[in-house]
Structure formats: structure tokens, C-alpha cells
């Protein structure tokens, strides 16, 4: 098995991996190029530059400014809408259900870094999947951190930072941080 296969497999499995690996950097560069092509000339026809990267897509609208790390670890259901300048860092799977709305500047991060500075200097990273169930609305500027599941029908308020699971049919915001 090649080193890239091991690094990619480790990354997706949530194990430590070398984020400075040349082949992973090449995959990220390809995704950035696809995003740049779409963002330079946003249209339904040009959105294919991004969605063809995705592991699976039901139906999606991606407003300009969309960015992703790899794309290949993103799955979206039907009626997915990402408002302007959304960022999905998909070192691990990001699985998004049907009828999900992301406000502008929503960021979803699967990547994380060790607390040890020496490991960080060496490019050690790890990633955990993010799951967003059906009928979720995430308000503008919210940040979803690695390993989080947001339950069906939940609402995440604007500018919230979500570091723990959100139960189904609850609201989580800066004003109401307790489910």
C-alpha cells in the first residue's frame, strides 16, 4: 500500500496523519482549484466543478465563496443550501442530510491538531467526522467543530461555536447555549 493511501486512510479514520504529506497537499490543491473555478464564475453549470468532488450529492445550491479541503469526504442530501462563504474542511467525513440550510460564513471543521507543539511542528493532525441530520438550520457565522453530530430538526444560532453534540429538535445559540 502506498504512503498516500496510508495517510489518506489514517486521516479519514480519525488516526494521526501527516497533513504536510505531498499527495494530500496535491488533493487539497485540486479541490481549491475546483472551488476557484466555481467562485470566479458562479452558476449552476459551474457548480459541477465542486459537486463532482463530493462523495455523494442529492441536490445542492452553493453560493459563491464556498471552500473545501478535499471534497471527497463530503456527502449532502437533497435540498442542501450553503449561503455565501461557507467553508467545509473535510479531512474526515462531513455527512449532511436532507433539507439542511447553512447561513453565510458557516464553517465546519473536521481537522484538529495535537496539544503538543513538537507534534504540530511535524505536521501531525487528526480528524473526526461531522454529521448533520435532516432539517437542520445553522445560522450565519456558526462554527461546527470536529466530531460533532447535530440532531434532526435542530437549530444552531448565528455565531455559535458547537463543540458537542446537539440533540434533535433543540436550539443552540449564544443566548441559549444549554439544549
Mark where each language-model region is.
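Flexible, glycine/small-residue-enriched loop-and-beta-strand segment within the central core
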Residues: 66-76, 81-150, 175-179
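Terminal amphipathic alpha-helical/low-complexity segments used for targeting or macromolecular assembly
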Residues: 1-59
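C-terminal end-helix/capping segment
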Residues: 162, 166-179
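Extended beta-solenoid/beta-helix repeat architectures
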Residues: 55, 148-151, 166
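Tight coil/turn sites that cap or link beta-strands
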Residues: 141, 153, 159, 169-170
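Arg/Lys-rich RNA-binding interfaces used to dock onto structured RNA substrates
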Residues: 58-67
Amino acid at each position: 500500500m502506498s504512503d498516500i493511501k496510508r495517510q489518506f486512510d489514517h486521516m479519514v479514520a480519525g488516526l494521526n496523519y501527516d497533513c504536510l504529506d505531498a499527495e494530500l497537499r496535491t488533493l487539497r490543491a485540486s479541490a481549491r482549484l475546483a472551488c476557484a473555478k466555481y467562485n470566479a464564475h458562479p452558476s449552476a453549470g459551474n457548480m459541477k466543478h465542486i459537486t463532482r468532488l463530493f462523495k455523494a450529492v442529492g441536490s445542492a445550491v452553493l453560493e459563491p465563496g464556498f471552500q473545501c479541503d478535499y471534497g471527497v469526504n463530503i456527502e449532502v442530501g437533497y435540498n442542501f443550501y450553503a449561503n455565501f462563504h461557507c467553508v467545509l474542511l473535510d479531512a474526515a467525513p462531513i455527512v449532511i442530510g436532507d433539507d439542511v440550510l447553512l447561513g453565510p460564513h458557516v464553517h465546519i471543521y473536521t481537522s484538529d491538531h495535537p496539544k503538543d507543539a513538537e507534534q504540530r511542528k511535524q505536521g501531525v493532525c487528526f480528524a473526526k467526522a461531522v454529521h448533520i441530520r435532516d432539517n437542520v438550520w445553522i445560522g450565519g457565522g456558526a462554527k461546527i467543530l470536529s466530531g460533532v453530530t447535530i440532531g434532526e430538526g435542530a437549530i444552531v444560532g448565528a455565531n455559535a461555536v458547537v463543540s458537542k453534540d446537539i440533540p434533535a429538535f433543540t436550539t443552540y445559540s449564544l443566548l441559549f447555549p444549554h439544549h
